[in-house]
Design a protein with these regions (language model features):
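Short acidic-glycine motifs
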Residues: 1-289
Length: 289
């Protein structure tokens, strides 16, 4: 089902009468969307090496000859297959009748959940320095998080996104006369977008590849993506990225009312910085086909 909760509040008032004022606000969103889904897993016969349901011959890659009775000895399974088939907590057996030529399509029913959390708030202060000078300062902070879709199987991996943002601004208005007003402003903003795979079950960790017989280091939790032909692939490429945008703005504007003419003088300088990390299309953990 779908559920969304939005909540928050505002509060403000004077700190010093006719001189100093403040305002704060907060808004939060929690969104959940869940329901049933199906996927395909290897049946018990396949886990025992019995591939007699396949219409074509099974060829032994070591000699190019058909496998007798389409029965592969379990002793010839690689470490990844043995670890996968020997751990039903990570890779469960079918729990319903499948369909398709081999009867495995949709043979496992599970649930999914899409999760979104969002928090944002502001703090603002106004200060009247003098009849001719007014200062304003504001700080804003936000955190938008999507947790993707909760995986149907522990060995499936989905991705999540963290999007923290923050900004600050200081503004000074100076009235020189009834016809001349100056506005000066300095601001800063930062937007970060972080994409990462999620180990929903917590059973994989950073040593899953080693436990599944896959060599190489593993800097993030998860399992390398293993593509298969008849049932759903497992694991994840582990595609990760981290992008941080920083923006600095310096602004000044002088407004002068000269008889019938309105004259504006000033400038706007912006410094933009982007720092980006991307693991590549093959991800951190890679893929096996």
């Amino acid at each position: 089902g779908f559920k969304r909760n939005i909540f928050g509040g505002t509060f403000g008032g004077p700190i010093k009468r006719d001189k100093l004022f403040f305002f704060v606000n907060y808004e939060g969103t929690r969104e959940r969307n869940d329901g049933p889904t199906t996927t395909s897993v290897a049946p018990q016969a396949w886990r025992n090496g019995d591939l007699s349901a396949f219409p074509n011959n099974i060829v032994d890659p070591t000699n190019g000859q058909p496998v007798p009775g389409k029965q592969i000895p379990v002793s010839r399974f690689g470490p990844t297959a043995r670890a996968l088939f020997g751990n039903p907590a990570l890779y469960p057996l079918p729990n319903q009748v499948g369909f398709g030529p081999l009867g495995v399509n949709g043979n496992y029913a599970a649930g999914f959940a899409n999760l979104i959390n969002n928090n944002q708030g502001d703090v603002k202060v106004d200060y009247r320095l003098s009849p001719k000078d007014n200062l304003m300062a504001r700080y804003s902070n936000g955190a938008y998080e999507t947790l993707g879709s909760r995986a149907a199987l522990p060995v499936f991996m989905t991705g999540g996104t963290d999007n923290p943002t923050q900004s600050a601004v200081v503004n000074w208005n100076r009235t020189f006369s009834a016809t001349i007003v100056n506005e000066a402003r300095v601001s800063y903003s930062r937007v970060v977008i972080q994409d990462r795979p999620i180990d929903w079950s917590g059973q994989l960790g950073t040593d899953a590849n080693a436990r599944f017989g896959i060599p190489g280091g593993q800097p993030i939790a998860g399992l390398s993506n293993i593509a298969t032909g008849q049932v759903a692939g497992i694991g994840s490429l582990g595609i990760a990225s981290n992008t941080a945008d920083n923006k600095f703005i310096y602004y000044n504007n002088l407004t002068w009312q000269k008889n019938k003419h309105l004259i504006k003088l000033g400038g706007n300088f912006m410094r933009y910085q982007q720092n980006r990390y991307y693991s590549g299309n093959n991800g951190v953990l890679g893929i096996f086909r």
